[in-house]
Amino acid sequence: MPILTESLTEKKPLAGNNEINQLAFVVHDIEKTSELFAKLLGIPKPAWFLTGDSEVSKVVFRSKPTNSRSKLVFMNTPTVQFELIEPNEEPGTMREFLDTVGEGIHHIAFDVDSIKEKLPIFEENGYPLLQSGEFTSSDGRYVYVDTLKDHKTLIELLESAEPRDTEQSKESYEPLLGTNKVEQLAIVVKDLDAAAEAYCKLLGVEKPQVIQSGPSELTKVVFEGEPTQGDSKYLFINTPLLQIELIEPGKSPSTWKKHLETHGEGVHHISFVIKNMNEKIKLLEEMGYPVIQTGNFYNGKGRYAYMDTTLDFKVIIELLERFDS
């Protein structure tokens, strides 16, 4: 989908800011997955570390102390930070996600000055505390709030005594797609207006314009090898680092409709703006990542391709190419 510019307003975000700084993936094999993500982003493979035991981490899940521990890897990009999480078998939100949903994006994160101040705001808005804990390698703490119903993903609040390390690796290689800048996080929803209201309240912004998919002779959507109208309506919400896209599928076949029918509401893809679309599609197909759907922007100013990268990257990757670039 095309990326639009939408100004932010002065409404107050629930977390005190609207900077989504992290996309966190729960995975079965952090060693293998971190190697794949390092190649995608063009950085050296970082080493994972194990979170502390219960005396250090003090994890409480659904109001009960737990010995939940996880292997973690952090990878910085020009926009958001990727976090990879391999949980142990003890009760915890990541273990629960892996057992019930499978691998994928578990949460988005915001930095806050004080969890003690911000958590009650979320709770007053109907988002209860799900899990809390202390950082292992630095002075800080986190909480997960249960925003799944409204935001289709969980939200983490991070409180750090010192600024977290978000600097990109000084040693870098050519990213797989020619860029490592994540542009979008896209979420498929049943009710666009309701989801938009929830996100705009979370982020402290006015509701953006709803966009209807363009005529099929312009968009030329092909889904799983067959032409389709691929109708939908959607909108874009800009944040400082990442754009949120909310998509409500129409009745005709499309990747969004299939996702909604198969997996329900939730994260559908992340996006990268690239050049030489045909070359990138060929590269990914040769690596074993087939095309799911292609089409043109609703306004005819670019095109997109969804690649089936879920096995390795735990989410669909969308390639975006602007015709004026």
Task: Give names to the regions the model predicted.
Residues 36-38, 95, 122, 198-200, ...:
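Conserved active-site tyrosine of GNAT-family acetyltransferases
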Residues 63, 99, 175-176, 261:
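Short consensus segments that form the blades of beta-propeller domains
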Residues 90-119, 256-282:
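Long, charged/polar, surface-exposed segments that mediate recognition or autoinhibition
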